[in-house]
Amino acid sequence: MELEQMVVKELGISMDDLRELIDRELEKIEFVKQRKAQLLEMEQLVKQKEAEVDHVDKLFDNATRAVDDCETLVKSLYDQIGMTYKESSSEDEGSSKPTEVIEIPDEDDDDVMSVGSGEAVSKIPKEKHLLREAMAAMKRSRQDVQSIVEAIQKKSDGPQTRFSSHPSSPTSSVGGSNQASASNDMSKDGDLVVGMRILGKKRTKTWHKGTLISIQCVGTGKKFKVKFDNKGKSLLSGNHIAYDYHPPPENLTVGSRVVAKYKDGNQVWLYAGIVAEPPSSKNKMRYLIFFDDGYASYVTHAELYPVCRPWSKSWEDIEDVSCRDFIQEYVNAYPNRPMVLLKSGQLIKTEWEGTWWKSKVEEVDGSLVKILFLDDKRCEWIYRGSTRLEPMFSMKTSNASTQEKQQAGQQRTRPNVGAIRSKGPVVQFTHDLTGNEPEHNPAAPPSPQSMPSPQLIDTDSDSQQAQSKKQVAKKSTSFRPGSAGSGQSSPIPTESVPQPPAAPRPFQSNQSVQPVQSIQPIQPIHNIQTIQTIQGIQTIQAIQPIQSIQTLQPIQTIQPLQTIQTLQGNRIVTSIQQFQIIRTENIPAESTYKAPKEKLFYLPHVCNYTCLSRIRPLSHRGKNPLLVPLLYDFRRMTARRRVNRKMGFHVIYKSPCGLSLRTMPEIERYLFETQCKMLFLEMFCLDPYVLVDRKFQPQKPFYYIPDITYGKEDVMLSCVNEIDRTPPPQVAYSKERIPGKGVFINTGADYLVGCDCTDGCRDKSKCACHQLTIQATACTPGAQSNPMAGYQHKRLEECLPTGVYECNKRCKCSANMCNNRLVQHGLQVRLQLFKTQNKGWGIRGLDDIAKGSFVCIYAGKILTDDFADKEGLEMGDEYFANLDHIESVENFKEGYESDAKSSSDSSGVDLKEDHEENSGSEDQEESNDSSDDNFGKNEDITTSSVWRSYATRRTTRGQKENGTSETASKDSRTRDETTDCKLPEETSKNKVASWLSSNTMADSVMDSDSRSSLKMGEALETDKPKESEEASKYPRFAEGNRAYGYNPTPTKKDGVRRPVTKTALHQIKRQSSSAQPTEEVLTLSSSSDSEVGSGTNGSKKPAAQATANDSDDIQTISSGSDEEEEKKNVAASAGPVKRQVAVKSTRGFALKSTHGITVKSNMASGEGGPGRRNTRQFFDGEESCYIIDAKLEGNLGRYLNHSCSPNLFVQNVFVDTHDLRFPWVAFFASKRIRAGTELTWDYNYEVGSVEGKKLLCCCGSTECRGRLL
C-alpha cells in the first residue's frame, strides 16, 4: 500500500488509471494484436471442433440404433428359420473361437457376404422376402458404419475410444477393421513412395524440392506430407506436389499441368502453370507456359516438372478467376487461338492499369511480344492473344456487342463486320504450330453423284441448297477504315456480304510418297480425293484419273447461248440454256505488240484536232486499255533519272505529233485540245513498274469459254478451268443493278444535280458534281472538307467513306471527255474467270493494273432486308452485299470508335516509312513482313528481366498486412541482391506515377471530365509521405535492370509471389488511395469479383502539348454509373430495334468472352442526343439497309474472293441517282497488280459473329487472319 501511494504521489495518477494506460499501450503493440487475433481464431476453432464432435456423436448414436434394429431383425430371422443367433464379440462365450461363415445363397447366386461368426447354415430360408429385407437392412447398416468411420477419423481420441469399446454386431466388425486400416499411414500410393524426392507447393505459391515422408488418408482422398530441403513441412494434396524429373515430351500436351522455372535476371523460381504451346521450329523448340498468376514465358524441356495428381480440368486448380477463365477458353479453343499479328517497329496501343498507352513493338518471340511503352520507356512481355493489346480488345468487345444485341433482339443473327482492319496489327487465328492439328469435322461417306466440283467450298456453285435455321451472312460495301487502299485510319462500323471460301484441305491419297530418284514420264494419277463442304457436311469425291500430258484430250471451248427473258406479272424472269461445248485444240493466240522502229520528231505547232485525224477510227476495242494508246501511235518510253542521289525510273509519252507528255496534267490537256474521244485518261499510266505489254497466258485448261458475259460487257470476260472439268455456275449475267420486289430507285434527271462544265470538269472548284464529293467529306470528324477529294486523273488513290459523285445525264459536259466519269463507262480492264485450287472460282487480271484504277462493280438484284432474310434462308447468303453507305458515314462522323487509329501516331502504324518509291525492284516494294519471320529472331536465347503476361489485366485495391502494403494479386518476393544498387532520386518512384500526377493536376482545369483525375491526383499527393517508408521495405533495382508487370489476380494474404518493382510500389500507392470508387473507373475484373480500381480518364500531356489528339495517345477504358444511360443513347441513336447487322456499338455492355470487361467511350463527339433520328428513317421511316444479291443474277463482281491482304478496295459511287440508299458498289485497285494475279477484296467478316458457323481463310497472305467466320 505504501508503494502504491508513493507511485501515485510521484506519477500523479491513480493505479487504476495507470493500469488502463498500460492496457491501452499494450493493445497498440503489433505483437499483442497478433496474439489476440490468434487467440480469437483458436477459440473459433475450438468451438468448431466441439460442434463437429457433437455432430459425430449424433451420427454415432443414430448408427448404433440402426445396428441394433438390424440385429433385432437378424435375430427374428434366425428364430423363424430355427437357428440360434450368437454374438461374435461376447466374451463369456469365447470370442477367440475361429469364425465361421454364414452363406446365404441368393436366387441368382450373385451375392456372398461374410456377416460374422456362427454355425454353418443347414437350412435354406423358405421365405425369400424376409431374407431380402434382412440383407437390405445389413447393407444400410454397413453404409452407416462406413460414414461413422470416416467421421471418427476427424474427431478426437475420446470418441474413438468410445466407439471401439462399444459392443459390435456382426456387421459392425467389418467397419471396425476398415477403420483400423484407414487410420494407418500408407507407404506407397501408385508411383509415389515414401522417401522419394518430390516438389511441393508452399504458401508463397512457389514450389520447392523436398522429400515425401508420409502418405495419409484424409476423408475420401489422400494427403502427402512433404519435408522441404530448406526447412518446413507441409501436408499437401496430390495436385500440389510434382515429380522431381522431367516428363517425356509425348506427355506434355496443351493443357498439361506442370511446374516450370521462371527466370528474372539472376533469380529463378518454380511456379505452377499449364502448357500452352508445344515446341516447334517457330518457337525454338520451347514450351510456352501460362503461369497461374497471369504471366507467360518460354521454357525448355529441362525446366519442366509434371504435377503428380493433376485435376482432369487443369484450369480448375487456378485460384484467380480471370486467369482460370482465360485458360479454360484457351484450352477449349486450341489449336484455334486468335493472336495479334505483329512485327518489330509497329506502333500499337497497349493497356496498363486501365489506360491505353502508345507503345511500340520491340521484339516478337513466338507467341510473345516485347512492348515498349513510349511514355516512360519501360518494357513488358505480353502474350499476343491478350486483350491488353488493342486489336484483340476491339475484336472481343465487338463480338460481345454482337452477342448482346442478338440476345436483346436488336440485331439479326448475321456476321457483324464492323471490326477494324488496321494496316499494321490485325488479329490472326493461328493453328497448331506442329502442323498436327486434329481434324474436327469428320468427313462423310463419298458421294460422287452429288459433287459437281472438287473444291472445298465452291462459293459459286448452285449445288449449295438452303439449310434450316441457317445464319445469314452479308458482306459490306461501305468504307473499311485502315484496309488496303484506304487513306483513313479511323474506325467505322460497317456491314457484311457474300460468303467467302473456306480453308483448303489437302488432297488425300492412299499411295505413300516415295523419294524421287529420277525424272520419269508422267503417269496417270489415281485415287486422288478432294473434300467438299456442302451445307456443313463434308463429302469426298474421287477425281477421275488424270491422263499423262502426252495423252490429254483436246480442251473444250464452251460457247454460251443467249439468255431468254420473259415477263411474268411484274417480274422479269431470266433463263439460260445450257452451255454449248465445242471441241478445239488450243486457246486462240493473241498477237504481240511490236513497237515501231521509226522515231517521232516534234515540229513546233499548236496541238489541235488534226494531230489525231489519221487515227480516229475506233478499231481497238477489247484490248488492254493501257496498250490502246500505243496502238494509236503513241509511244511510251521509260528513262532513268537521278533524284536525291538515287537513280529512279520515269515514264514519258510521245504523241503521234511528237509532243512529249511527262505528267498526267499534260496528257489531260493534250487529250482535251485534240478532242480525243477514243482515248480516255485512264488509259495512260506513268508508273514505271506497270508494263503495258505483259500478257498472262493460262496453261492448257480443261475448259475454255471465250466470253461468259454474252457480249453484255464492252470487254470479253473469258473463263478457264485448269483444275478439273467442272463448268462455271449457271448465272444470268447482268452488268446493271436489278431492283427487286418492293424496291424503287428514282433515276429521273429532275432529282439529280448536274454541272455546266465545258472544260471536261478539270476544274473541281467550278464543277457542281465535284463539289458534291468535296462537300460530303465535311461529314468526317473535324467537319473539314477535302478540296482534293474525288478522282485524280481518272484514278482513285484511296477510299472516300462519304462517296464519290460522278457526272450524270443532267450534266452538260461531254461524256467522253469528262474527267469525272469513270465507273459509268463500265468494264475496261481485261479480266478472266478461273478455277482456283481451293477457293472455288475467282477473277484475275490478264494485264497489269495500275494503282487506283477502276476494275468493276458489284451488280445483282437489290432486295429489302426482310426479303433478303427470307431468301437467304432458302437460297443461301453467299452473295449478299449490304448497301450500308448511310450507316457507315453516320458512324464515321459521330466517332463511334473513340479509340480508333485516326492519325499516324495511333495503333497499327509502322515507324519505318518507305520513301523510295521509284527505286529497287517491284518485288521488293510488294513484299510484306510477317510476325512469323520474326519468330525466334535472336538465335541466343537470353533470359529477360522484363515480366511477361497473358491474362486480362485489371486494377485492384491494395491491402495492408503486417503494416506493409502488398500488390493486388501477386505475392511480392524480395530478392537478394549481391550489391546494394541505389536509384537516382527522380526514379525512386515510378515515372508514370509522377507524369500522371503532375500533368493531371496541371491540366485539371482544362479537362472536360476531370473528376476522377482530380481524385487520383489528390490521392497521390496524400501518399507521397508514405512512399519512402514503403520503398525502404522493398529492394532497390538499378535503372538498367527494371522489371515491370501487372496484377491480374485479387489480393492474397499468403506469402510472396513475384519480386517487387517500382511499378508495384506505384500500384500499391494508387490502390491504397482508391478506397472510394470514382465515377470513371476501369473494370477489367472477373464476373465473380466486384473489385473496382481507379484509373485515369483522358489524362493529358503537358500544357504546351495538350491537344484534342490526346485521346489518341492515352485512353481510359471506363465503366461508370452512367452505363445504362449510354446504352439508351446508343439504342436511340441507332434507330428502331429492327436494325442492320453491321452497325457496331462499343458502349456500355458486358463482355463475357473476356471475363467481365466493360467499356465506355470517352470521346465527346460520340455522344448523340437520345432523340436524334437515323438518316435512313427520313426515307419513309425505313429501318434497315437494302441488300444486293448476286446469287442468281449478277456480274463478275460475285466471283471476287476474299483476302486478308486484298488488292482491291470498295468505293460507293453515285451515278444514276443521288439517293443515299442506292450507290453503285465499285472496286478500285489499292496497289499495282501484276498480270495473272487474282483480284481480291476484304470481306471483313467478324470472327465468331455467327454461332455455329465457321469458315477458315485460305487466302495465303502473310497477314492471313486464319478465319473468316
Swiss-Prot record:
GO terms for biological process: DNA methylation-dependent constitutive heterochromatin formation; heterochromatin organization; methylation; negative regulation of gene expression. Residues 829-1244 form the SET domain. Zn(2+) 2 binds at residues 755, 769, 807, 811. Zn(2+) 3 binds at residues 761, 807, 813, 818. Residues 968-989, 1021-1033 have a biased composition (Basic and acidic residues). PROSITE patterns: MBD, POST_SET, PRE_SET, SAM_MT43_SUVAR39_1, SET. Residues 164-177, 462-476, 1078-1094 have a biased composition (Low complexity). Keywords: Chromatin regulator, Chromosome, Coiled coil, Metal-binding, Methyltransferase, Nucleus, Repeat, Repressor, S-adenosyl-L-methionine, Transcription, Transcription regulation, Transferase, Zinc. Residues 250-312, 340-395 form the Tudor domain. GO terms for molecular function: DNA binding; histone H3K9 methyltransferase activity; histone H3K9 monomethyltransferase activity; histone H3K9me2 methyltransferase activity; promoter-specific chromatin binding; zinc ion binding. InterPro entries: DNA-bd_dom_sf, DUF5604, Hist-Lys_N-MeTrfase_SETDB1, Methyl_CpG_DNA-bd, Post-SET_dom, Pre-SET_dom, SET_dom, SET_dom_sf. Residues 9-63 form a coiled coil. Its EC number is 2.1.1.366. It catalyses: N(6),N(6)-dimethyl-L-lysyl(9)-[histone H3] + S-adenosyl-L-methionine = N(6),N(6),N(6)-trimethyl-L-lysyl(9)-[histone H3] + S-adenosyl-L-homocysteine + H(+). Zn(2+) 1 binds at residues 755, 757, 761, 767. Residues 396-414, 486-497, 1106-1120 have a biased composition (Polar residues). Belongs to the class V-like SAM-binding methyltransferase superfamily. Histone-lysine methyltransferase family. Suvar3-9 subfamily. This is Histone-lysine N-methyltransferase SETDB1. The gene is setdb1.
